[in-house]
Structure formats: C-alpha cells, structure tokens
C-alpha cells in the first residue's frame, strides 16, 4: 500500500491527474495547428454536460499558465451572465455573481493566446425552492466521497478517492423557511447506506442558513473517517448542497475541512517523523497547514465537490456519543 501511495502521488502531481467529476481531461493537451503553443487540457463542466449544478463555476485548465486569460458566459439567448473571471496557476476560473437559472443552457468562452474556445452546458432542474421545508425532516442522504471532484489537495484527488473507504450520512432533523439543522454520521464500510455505530455522530452545532432555499451549508464540526483502514481526523468539516425539487437528493454537494496527515505517515513516509507526509507533498508545491488543535502544520486542506447524495429509503441516523461507543461491546477494538 505504501508503494501505491507514493507512486500514485508522484504520477498524479507531476502529470496533472485524471478526469474529475463532470470534467474532461485531454491527457496534457494538444498544440494549436496555427502555431499557438498553449492548449486546453481540461474543462469543468465538461462540454455538453446536461445536468450541471446551478451554482457551478467554470474552469479551463491550460497547458501553460496565462495571467491575462479570461472567461465570459452567456445564456441560451446570448445574454451575458454576470460573473468574475480569475486565474490561479494554469487554471482559468469564472464564478457567477448570482446562482444560475435551473434547466437553462449556457455557453462559456475562454479568451487566451490561442483562438477563443467555448463549451456549452445545461443546468439541471435543481434550483427551484422546496415548497414545504418541513417535508425534508427525517430524510437521510448518503454522500459518496469517492464520487466527488477533489479540488484540494490539488493533483492528488485520484489517490484520496481510492483510499477513502467510507461515505457520510446526513439526516435533516428540523427545517423551516430560514434554517435547517442536520446530524451526520460516518457510513459503514460494508454498506454506504448504513451508519457505522462505532463512530461518534457529527453533531453540527449551528443550524444552517436556509434562506437561499434549496441551498444550504452546515458546519463546521469535527469527525473521523477511514483512509486505507486508518482513522483520520477531519477538522472544521462543512457540507453544502441544494435539495432536488422533490427532496429525494442533494445535488452539487461539497465537503470541506482539513485532514490530519500524521496517521498516514506509516503508509506514505515510513520511518519519518510527524511531518513525513507534509515533507513529501511539499516537494510538489502542496503546503500543509496548521491543524485546528494548534499542534502544528501537519494538516492538508480538503475540498470535495460535485457530489450527488441520494436519499436513503427508510434511513435513520442514530445519535452516538463517545460514551455510547466506548460502552458498546460490539465496538471493541475500533
């Protein structure tokens, strides 16, 4: 497993990785026959996407960074859509000033040193408000981390998605027109729709603002997940997304937080100190950050987006405290 991690990490960071959710990857790009030496290696969303998230941004990944590159977006009628274009490294990004309309066609055009390039996409029906917020209460949704787009740490998403062996369950515990409360749980490794009763539940301490119905964001809170069979702490876990019109799914789900790398040292940097993983990723320009507990710069920022969380029929999240887990004989050895 250690050699898999190192080989994969080197390959993905050095070469740019593989296809991400809803993105296209041309494997390094091609040069323009007119003589332009730059090219587009990936876009997000993919050209022709028919179910884009209504709060999505647009990204064009270039072979070579261009500080002056820009993106403009128009709707199906050709009207300009307000937004901000920016460049981070070799990625040109555009974010809308307001959420896009549901079930609407858009075209994004990149202007850079080569000829302008465009992609087209259509948003899904997600975006219309839930008529009765209370109808969401009791619904449980399964969030599959392995199916998301790993935005951070950059370049190593394929490795993390291959090692994350569990998902997250989210239950709506109360909801009204302005706020929504949720409780989370780590899913069992054997069944992504079942709760791991030997792990404490994620008790988000603050209700989420639901004034942008159907969009919500809940958290932050701390939890533990399994990576290659090792328990890893995630600090400041926050989850966001938007409910589908009939409440049977959460679309555009995103998860963010910071992951403690120290338990991964035996897998990735055997024989090294607490900073073994951080030293390795630093050689590829990926910095570790200070952990939330103040113990040192041993954590990596984690962000996963573009997930769909389907409702679990008959699902139920049972609140579990540390004492519950400790006193449960079936949890011995966990």
Region annotations inferred by a language model:
Residues 1-8:
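Sec-dependent signal peptide recognition
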Residues 8-11, 23, 27, 83-85, ...:
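Small side chains
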Residues 34-130:
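Acidic, low-complexity Ser/Thr/Gly/Pro-rich repeat segments typical of extracellular/periplasmic
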């Amino acid at each position: 497993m250690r050699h898999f991690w190192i080989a994969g990490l080197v390959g993905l960071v050095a070469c740019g990785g593989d296809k991400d959710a809803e993105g296209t990857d041309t494997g390094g790009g091609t040069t323009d026959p007119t003589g332009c030496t730059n090219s587009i290696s990936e876009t997000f969303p993919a050209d022709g996407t028919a179910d884009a998230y209504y709060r999505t941004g647009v990204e064009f990944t270039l072979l070579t960074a261009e500080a002056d590159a820009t993106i403009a977006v128009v709707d199906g009628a050709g009207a300009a859509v307000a937004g901000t274009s920016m460049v981070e490294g070799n990625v040109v990004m555009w974010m809308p000033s307001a959420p896009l309309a549901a079930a609407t066609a858009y075209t994004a055009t990149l202007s850079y040193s080569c000829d302008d390039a465009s992609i087209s996409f259509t948003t899904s029906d997600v975006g219309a408000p839930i008529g009765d917020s209370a109808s969401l209460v009791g619904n449980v949704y399964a969030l599959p981390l392995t199916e998301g787009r790993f935005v951070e740490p950059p370049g190593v998403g394929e490795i993390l998605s291959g090692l994350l062996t569990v998902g997250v369950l989210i239950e709506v515990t109360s909801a009204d027109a302005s706020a929504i409360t949720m409780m989370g749980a780590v899913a069992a490794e054997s069944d992504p729709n079942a709760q791991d009763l030997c792990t404490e539940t994620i008790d988000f301490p603050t209700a989420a603002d639901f004034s942008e119905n159907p969009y919500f964001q809940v958290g932050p809170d701390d939890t533990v997940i399994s990576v290659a069979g090792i328990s890893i702490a995630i600090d400041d876990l926050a989850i966001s997304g938007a409910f589908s019109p009939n409440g049977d799914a959460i679309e555009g789900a995103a998860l963010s937080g910071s992951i403690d790398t120290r338990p991964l040292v035996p897998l990735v940097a055997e024989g090294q100190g607490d900073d073994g993983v951080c030293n390795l990723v630093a050689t590829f320009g990926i910095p570790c950050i200070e952990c939330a507990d103040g113990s040192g710069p041993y954590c990596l920022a984690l962000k996963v987006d573009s997930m769909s969380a389907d409702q679990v029929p008959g699902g139920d999240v049972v609140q579990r405290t540390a004492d519950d887990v400790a006193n449960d004989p079936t949890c011995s050895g966990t």
